């Protein structure tokens, strides 16, 4: 509720001041900008909440088909190029040209959220690398960064809703706090496993292992 109340309180406060005429004409544009920014935060938050609800219920989700993961990653890195440039972070895609059995839109969200997070918690001059690996039993996607790192005792908690490792800079970093939770639920939808490896002050690697549709126990009819 805190994540919803904070932007709503800001919007209400700025709007009330403007309505009462307690704002100087030269401040109206600035206050309008604040209201717009908080509204955009709410739109993003509601969108992520809806996506999590869909993944939880497995309702209204796109079908899974054979998807070119390399091309998908290229597209998402292109979307993040501006954000990376602002942080002076370089983006890289290396490894094998692999395909996975998945829902393209949800896979795109997974890759975007992982890389967006890696950029936000990175250092100036750092890097974010997606490494794709073809395996006998499927494919592996690893997003590796040179950021602040995560304490080992918090590896599992980073996938909780609204959990942030660096709470003191949550407003500065931005985001909804739901990105990695969406990754976790989307991975489950694709029957993929997640592992985390991180060293404080050096960086983090989050790895997804996607099983082959030919693997034992793989459910191609999962909805």
Where are these regions (language model features)?
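Short alpha-helical segment of the dimerization/phosphotransfer core of two-component systems
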Residues: 37-42
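Conserved micro-motifs of the catalytic ATP-binding
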Residues: 57-63, 95, 99-105
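A conserved beta-strand-to-alpha-helix junction within the catalytic ATP-binding
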Residues: 63-81
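Short conserved segment of the HATPase_c
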Residues: 150-164, 184
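Short acidic helix/loop segment immediately C-terminal to the autophosphorylated histidine
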Residues: 19-26
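Short conserved segments within the C-terminal catalytic ATPase subdomain
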Residues: 83-93, 97
């Amino acid at each position: 509720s805190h994540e919803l109340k904070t932007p709503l309180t800001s919007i209400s406060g700025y709007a009330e001041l403007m309505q009462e005429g307690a704002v100087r004409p030269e401040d109206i544009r600035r206050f309008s900008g604040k209201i717009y920014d908080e509204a955009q935060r709410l739109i993003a938050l509601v969108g992520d909440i809806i996506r999590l609800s869909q993944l939880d219920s497995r309702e209204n989700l796109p079908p899974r088909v054979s998807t070119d993961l390399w091309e998908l990653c290229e597209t998402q890195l292109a979307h993040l190029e501006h954000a990376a440039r602002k942080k002076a972070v370089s983006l890289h895609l290396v490894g094998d040209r692999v395909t996975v059995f998945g829902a393209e839109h949800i896979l795109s969200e997974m890759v975007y959220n992982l890389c967006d997070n890696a950029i936000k918690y990175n250092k100036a001059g750092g890097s974010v690398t997606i490494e794709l690996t073809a395996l006998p039993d499927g494919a592996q996607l690893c997003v590796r960064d040179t950021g602040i790192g995560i304490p080992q005792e918090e590896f599992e908690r980073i996938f909780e809703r609204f959990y942030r490792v660096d709470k003191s800079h949550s407003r500065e970093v931005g985001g909804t706090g739901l990105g990695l939770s969406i990754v976790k639920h989307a991975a489950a939808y694709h029957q993929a496993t997640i592992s985390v490896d991180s060293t404080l002050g050096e960086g983090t690697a989050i790895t997804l292992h996607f099983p082959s549709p030919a693997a034992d126990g793989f459910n191609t009819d999962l909805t």
